[in-house]
Amino acid sequence: MDSLRLGTYTFSSRLILGTGKFSSTSAMIKAVRASGTQLVTVALRRFNREQAEDDLFGPLSEIEGLTLMPNTSGAATAKEAIKAAHIARELSGSPFIKVEIHPNPHHLMPDPIETWEACKILAAEGFIVMPYIPADPVLAKRLEEVGCSSVMPLGSAIGSGQGLSTAEMVKIIIRESSVPVIVDAGLRSPSEACAAMEMGCEAVLVNSAVAVARDPAAMALAFAKAVEAGFEARNAGLMPRSGSAVATSPLTSFLGATR
């Protein structure tokens, strides 16, 4: 599978994994290893080396070839997100930052105005900026223009498991973007991840669907296989849709010859 390029980094895996909601750090680490992912996102509050039970930085740092992408989850404004990004870079040493600004805890929809403000500043400061956004083609283009390394439109609401309810808007974003489009949030099943890749996404980010599965490691592996299958299918060339049936083995000439 071709490499995913984000900023100056390349990744052979196109599955990005979130690290929240797992029943234990051990379960999360097993899922990360099973998935083969090379990029995981971690909330700033989980960088806590003084309290081992809350710290994810240490265990994740032990996985060879894994890059950490801190996120600004919990930020309600651009100012808070920028502050969180600075702290995260100092603690992790990672140039990546996933900008998440969702001020309303009831629906967790990303704030487009505050997100744009934060991304403009962080990109200028040299971060590899990956914003979580509504499936808005205009916003996605504006974020690309200020220097974001990718755009991450939601498939549906965070943790909802409602799948690719924004598929038509995501398709427009893909057509108009010059940076990788990565579906983030709402995916429930590996088949939805496969569909996202088939439609043209460069990667998918999954968290809840893996974390709350009966067997997170097995589900992580299933998502990894689905992402690869979707990417390979797209490159192979999906057959066009037809409004009517098209016979695969026409028998007209054969039947005529036997009369």
Curated annotation (Swiss-Prot):
Binding site for 1-deoxy-D-xylulose 5-phosphate: G159, A185, G186, N207, S208
One of the GO biological process terms: thiamine diphosphate biosynthetic process
Species this protein is from: Chlorobaculum tepidum (strain ATCC 49652 / DSM 12025 / NBRC 103806 / TLS) (Chlorobium tepidum)
The protein's name in its UniProt record: Thiazole synthase
Record's signal peptide: none
Molecular function per GO: thiazole synthase activity
Biological function: Catalyzes the rearrangement of 1-deoxy-D-xylulose 5-phosphate (DXP) to produce the thiazole phosphate moiety of thiamine. Sulfur is provided by the thiocarboxylate moiety of the carrier protein ThiS. In vitro, sulfur can be provided by H(2)S.
Reaction equation(s) it catalyzes: [ThiS sulfur-carrier protein]-C-terminal-Gly-aminoethanethioate + 2-iminoacetate + 1-deoxy-D-xylulose 5-phosphate = [ThiS sulfur-carrier protein]-C-terminal Gly-Gly + 2-[(2R,5Z)-2-carboxy-4-methylthiazol-5(2H)-ylidene]ethyl phosphate + 2 H2O + H(+)
Subcellular location, record wording: Cytoplasm
GO cellular component entries: cytoplasm
HAMAP family: ThiG
UniProt cross-references to InterPro entries, sorted A to Z: Aldolase_TIM, Thiazole_synthase_ThiG, ThiG
Active site per UniProt: K98 (schiff-base intermediate with dxp)
Gene: thiG
Assembly and interaction partners: Homotetramer. Forms heterodimers with either ThiH or ThiS.
EC number(s) recorded for this UniProt protein: 2.8.1.10
Organism classification: Bacteria, Pseudomonadati, Chlorobiota, Chlorobiia, Chlorobiales
Keyword terms, alphabetized: Cytoplasm, Schiff base, Thiamine biosynthesis, Transferase
Top EC class for this record: transferase
Family indicated by similarity: Belongs to the ThiG family.
Pathway in which the depicted protein is active: Cofactor biosynthesis; thiamine diphosphate biosynthesis
Matching Pfam families: ThiG
